[in-house]
Amino acid sequence: MAVKGRENLIAKQWKHGLHKYIAGIIKGKEQKSIIVNGMPDHIHVFIGLKPSMAISDLVRDIKNNSSNFINEKKFVKGRFSWQEGYGAFSYGHSQIESVYDYILKQEEHHKKRMFREEYLDLL
């Protein structure tokens, strides 16, 4: 999920709180949060999704609730919102560890590549 306008609004001081909050949203929807991590302008959310849950519904709830959380806490000046849309990918059980490591090492990864390059490679 990307911040609206790709602005660098997710600050180090509160990003871990945001990640925990998003993991709580996922757990509250009875899904499995594997890892949440990201950069100042976007986040990656790795979820074990049950077949009964539509990814679009879960992403909508994550975006709505996390935007409200950020705005209520006044983490940013003005109004925070996520960009429209999202990218969703499915992975096999054998890929869980490599996807987890990829998301865990976002800061290191982005020292080498920009988000656009990263996203195009995932497609």
What would you call each of these model-derived segments?
Residues 1-123:
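Basic nucleic-acid-binding interfaces
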